Amino acid sequence: MREAGKRTRGRGTTARPGRPRQAEVARLAGVSQTTVSLVLGKKTGGAAISEETRQKVVGAAESLGYVPDPAARRLAAARNNLLGVFSFTATFPTDVQHSYYPFLVGVEQEAAAQGYDLVLFTGSSPGGTGGGTHALHRARLADGCLILGRHAPTAELCRLVAEGFPVVHLGRRDEPEGPAWVGADYVSASRGVVERLVALGHRRIVLVREDDEAPASTDREQGVREGLEEAGLPVGPEAVFRSADPARELTSDRVREWVADGVTAFVAEETDTSAAWRALNAALAEAGLNCPGDVSLALLGSPPPDAADGPTPAGFDIPRAQLGAAAVRLLAALVAGEQASEPLVACTFRPGDTLAPPRRTSPQPPDPLPGPRVPGRGRNRNTRTEQGEPTQ
C-alpha cells in the first residue's frame, strides 16, 4: 500500500464569546426578560403564560444555545476540564458490540492522560430524550465537544464553530467552515485492497456500497476506482453498485448475473449499519456461491462484531482507538486556543480467509430445487426422446 495520505485539518480558536443572555432570548422571542426568566426557570410565579409564548421562549433559547441551568453558567465562567461526546447514531455506543465503541476507548484513555473528564450526551442519539440536533445547544456545558456519527448535522456544527466553540468530528468532513476533524486514510487503504485482488489475477471487481454521500463512503469509492484505473480495469458505472436498500435490492439473481458476466471479486464498504456487507453475504449464500472458491470477497473496514463466527474477511482494520485518542489531542489543543492538526491515520491490511485467485471458468450456481419431473424437460436440446424425436 502507498504511504498514508497527509491531508490535515486543524483550526485555531479565539477567545470564546460570552454565552447568550436572557435579554437576547427575550429580544428574539419578542417577550420581556421577566417572561424568559419565568419560562426557563419553570416557575410561573402566579403569572399566566400561554403555551404559544412558552414555545417562543424555548425555541429562541435553543436557537441561541442558551443554557439556563445556574450550575452550567458557573461552569462557563472558566475552563472546567470537561470534554463532551455527542453520538449521532441510533444508540449511544456504550455497548462493546457497537462499531463505535473502540473510538470511545481511545477517547477515554487520552482524556485521562490530558487531565480531562468526559460528559456523554446521550440525548444526541435519536433514541435519547434530547431531541437529536437540538441537543447540541447543551454542548456548552463542556469546554469543547467530540462528535461521532456519519450524519452529524452540518448547519448546527458550523454554527458552533462560527461562535468559537471548539468542536472535533471523528471522521473526515468536506465543509471548509465546518469543524476540525480526524480521520482514517480510507483512500489508500481501499486502493491497497484492489491492488491485492489484481495481484491475484482478478480483472472484474464490483464495489457494493450504500447510497450515501458521507465522506467515509466517497473516500472508499475513490480508492477502489484509483486501484482499478491504475490496473487498467473498468471504472465505469458497472464497477460500483450503490443502493439505498441493499437488503432488498442486492438479490441472489443480481449476484448470479454479475458472476455470469465475468465478475470474480466483490468489495463492500463498512458503515455503522453494515447494510451493504450483510446484504452481499446473504445474496452470495442464497446464490450458492462459495467464498473464496467461487468468488473472492473483501470488506473495506472491520467486520461487525456479531458476524465473527464466519470466515475472516480480507480487507483492512480501522485504528479506532488511535483515532479516538487523536481526536482528544486535537480538541484539547483547540480548547487551549492553539493551532493544531492531526494527519490522516493509516489503516492496516487484513489478509483474512476470503481471497483466492479467480477460477479459470465461471462457477455455475446450483439450479433451484427441482419440482416434479416432467418428461422431456431439463434435457439438452440435442438429446432425443425414447421415441427418437428431438426435444423442444
Describe each PLM feature range.
Residues 90-102, 120-129, 182-192, 208-254, ...:
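Hinge/beta->alpha junction and helix N-cap segments in small-molecule ligand-binding domains
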Residues 1-79, 362, 369, 373-391:
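N-terminal helix-turn-helix DNA-binding module of bacterial transcription factors
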Residues 51, 55, 63-134:
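Amphipathic helical "hinge" segments at domain boundaries
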